[in-house]
Amino acid sequence: LVMDARATGRTPLYLDEIIRRVPANLNELGYMGTIHRDSVDEQQLSGNGWMLRGLCEYYLWKRDEKLLPVISRMADNLFVGGEKYYESYPISPESRKKGVGAASGSLSQIIGHWRLSTDIGCVFIGMEGMLHALQVTKDEKLRPVADKLVNLFLNVDLTGIKAQTHASLTAMRGLIRYADITGKPEYVNEVEKRWEI
């Protein structure tokens, strides 16, 4: 909605009210969904990644300072909070269930501390939202998490795990954003390589 509003110059009727209501509809740690103490839900990272993107875009458009702590808390408690599990994300095609995958994700299987989605690779949708939060908040606590998730993405065989197209393309947008954040154009080169897949 925010991107549409910015592109058309017409604010959707209920957009400001939706944004105003977001904080009251988050859990006690400041993000959407169930609090998983000993696991990470891939679909939850994705949904909150989309939410972060929307909140960041709204902030950049309206400069609504009340959103910065909402963005920071969501990124910190969900993404920094799950940092210890990122290296164990199952990237091996052999570890994945065969014959699953849908644009609308649901729980596919549990491997270790990961609650995996049928929307394969949607963890990287979350990564893109978290990278946008890093760009907007400049919160250096997010930097090591960003490095871990970006490196994870760079090591995934997207065709091997049958990653969803929208998850892969969203992650590539995140890499372009990270190239801007870090000043490292090699991330753009990585996007170009994956674009050819």
Language-model features: locations:
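Glycan-recognition and catalytic cores of secretory/periplasmic carbohydrate-active enzymes
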Residues: L1-I197
